[in-house]
Amino acid sequence: MHHDLKHRIQAMRVKLEGRAPVAEIQGSSQLFVTPSPECRRLVELADVRETDRILEPSAGTGAILQAIRDAVPRAKCDAVELHAGLARHLQAHFPEVRIWCGDFLEYHPERRYTRIIMNPPFNRGDDIRHIRRALTLLEPGGILTGICLDGPRQQKALESLAD
């Protein structure tokens, strides 16, 4: 029995070593990688076009940025990422995207965006704070698509914002 467990662990180790990690992330409990189908759906709902100025305010590993790139390769994107290691990863893998490393709530771009696509942090109501902040950066007539919790607090806070 002990030998079998040791063998299975070794087999898993070999599989893991054969993969390149998306990024080395240390101690970030607020990082939730958005699965590809959800990313594609967010981009589809945003109706992204080449002429749009797009913001991804919690870029993480770049899953949403990749979906944007796949859908509209020439789209102009900016991204914000709090974690310095992830910001470096994003800059290396998305050189065409302007990356700002810092707290999105303190981000002050020169211009507003026509599209904002996001999966904000959910801890202690951060999703609502990030969505409200994102709306202040959206051009009139712009589109924001995002993921947030679906609890009573979120429903109440976002009810007046949805159309």
Regions found by a protein language model. Give the residues of each.
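Class I S-adenosyl-L-methionine-dependent methyltransferase catalytic core
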Residues: 1-163
